[in-house]
């Protein structure tokens, strides 16, 4: 979650979870910035640089039909009075890392049974227990989908260590049926003497 950063010269420290019109939001290389308003993603930016927030969703007497605009503006002002002068909106900035995440280690908790055919003509079959250990990397390709399905409404930050167990579990759930399929193919063991 992004944090406000008022300048030293500013007399206004700003409010948490309120983004004012024209605010500059820095987006670094390898990041995707999401602006969430009232729990809904309203802006997405994945280009490095400064993103300028445009709050043109607020009604103004200077746009549209004067009578309608004036009525909408008074409704907004009345709503602000009920919220103590604030906008009454919860606005948040979230940054999602789009770079490749480092090595995530995995291993099988229990051995996986695997059958190997040693000699088909003699009917020798061998069952072995396999253990798998290794590492993998991952990358968030669709930050919007990741936000909505995995980490929405995080109070401070969602670390890679929080998603690693889920990724490991999904890898193991995919690996075991794949090994079972290989085992069903009756793989033939090739010894050094038969090569």
Task: Locate predicted features.
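Interfacial loop/beta elements and low-complexity acidic/Ser/Thr-rich segments
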Residues: 1-133, 137-151, 155
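Short amphipathic alpha-helical patches
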Residues: 57-58, 159, 194
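Short, solvent-exposed coil/turn linker segments
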Residues: 97, 159, 183-187
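Residue-level detector of conserved catalytic or cofactor/ligand-binding positions
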Residues: 186-194
